[in-house]
Regions:
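Extended catalytic cores of very large enzyme megasubunits
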Residues: 1-347
Length: 347
């Protein structure tokens, strides 16, 4: 490994060994990963895969390489790179929070066909004696947020108790990294209350859903470093999303910086529609919105012949994987070098 590769390994994938007060070596990281799969591999496969990873000929799921062990046992989602969800239920928001806290990227859609399924919000709000007690865990944060959203839909504004959440900077011994403390979660709770109160008596708009998703991603940090990955799909005709990153949005709606935005084309647009979208992209000075063609993804699925091509596909944040609603994906790599042959790459 060169110096840069060593840095990436030590800072991203090497687990800390408390008993030895150091991080894993590259060999120890691979050993932990191979050992995790137990009897799913025979002895010959273990030897071959270990050598291939060690010599940088292949890379396995890097999410699993990081979390294999107790962390992956506790949160299976942590083994996946990315996912896709349609915002069509109040539960979509807390599910997204949990997935992001596991380090998995999220593609999501706020197209009208999905967000129209959300319920209407109460016409009036009032404070209640209900207290949401937030546990100190990923699933605990997500469940607490689900409770908040549920109460807000019925017009109830609860209190919350985050005293059990470990302070900022505390070591996350199982998952690795440092705790963010309760402050980001409290910020999200307050943001959510304001947003729901502003939508009293109606359904959330696509832009409001988008902002809520971005704010959820904004709180998912480890050691103060952002680690959420998002892509937001919206209707081609949605002018509010088209304008979401125009002007000085970063001063007033900074959470929007957490997501890449793309218009979802369900059929070939007219020349005028296409030109309008590109003009908007240029005028925004942010390079957004991008373009995601659902029609093209359906054609690709049909060409592959491995799944139902009539589904309304979405995508992962990098937009290279076609995904169904609630589907996850993973990435692995074969490193091609000049001395490789077709036979060596196929082994």
């Amino acid at each position: 490994m060169d110096a840069y590769q060593q840095y990436i390994h030590k800072s991203r994938y090497a687990r800390y060994l408390p008993s030895e007060e150091r991080r894993e070596t590259w060999k120890e990281t691979i050993t932990r990963y191979i050992k995790y799969w137990g009897d799913q591999l025979n002895d010959d496969e273990r030897v071959e895969i270990f050598k291939a990873i060690h010599d940088l000929e292949v890379m396995p799921s890097m999410r699993a390489l990081m979390t294999a062990g107790e962390a992956l046992d506790r949160d299976n989602m942590a083994g996946f790179n990315c996912s896709y969800i349609a915002i069509d239920s109040p539960r979509s928001f807390d599910e997204m929070m949990y997935v992001l806290m596991c380090g998995t990227g999220v593609g999501y859609s706020v197209e009208e066909q999905y967000i129209s399924k959300l319920p209407e919000i109460a016409e009036e709000f009032h404070a209640t004696d209900t207290v949401i007690h937030v546990p100190d865990s990923k699933i605990g944060w997500a469940k607490s947020y689900r409770e908040l959203v549920s109460l807000l839909y019925s017009g109830q504004i609860p209190e919350w108790d985050t005293s059990r959440v470990r302070p900022a900077g505390a070591s996350l011994k199982t998952f690795g990294g440092r705790a963010s403390g309760p402050e980001p979660l409290v910020d999200l709770f307050k943001f959510t209350v304001r947003l729901f109160k502003g939508a009293a008596g109606r359904k959330l708009t696509p832009l409001e859903c988008h902002d809520l998703c971005c704010k959820i991603a904004q709180i998912v940090v480890v050691g103060g470093v952002r680690r959420s990955a998002l892509i937001s799909l919206s209707d081609l005709s949605d002018d509010a999303l088209r304008q979401a990153k125009h002007g000085a949005w970063y001063n007033t709606e900074s959470q929007r910086g957490l997501a890449n935005n793309s218009a979802c084309y369900t059929s070939k647009p007219s020349f005028e529609q296409f030109l309008d979208e590109w003009r908007s992209l240029y005028e925004s000075k942010s390079g957004e919105r991008g373009i995601f063609s659902r029609a093209a993804s359906q054609k690709q699925a049909e060409r592959n012949g491995r799944r139902d091509s009539d589904r309304d596909f979405g995508t992962n944040p990098c937009s290279e994987i076609i995904l169904r609603k609630s589907q996850v994906c993973n990435l692995s790599e074969v490193v091609v070098r000049p001395e490789d042959t077709a036979e060596s790459l196929r082994r």
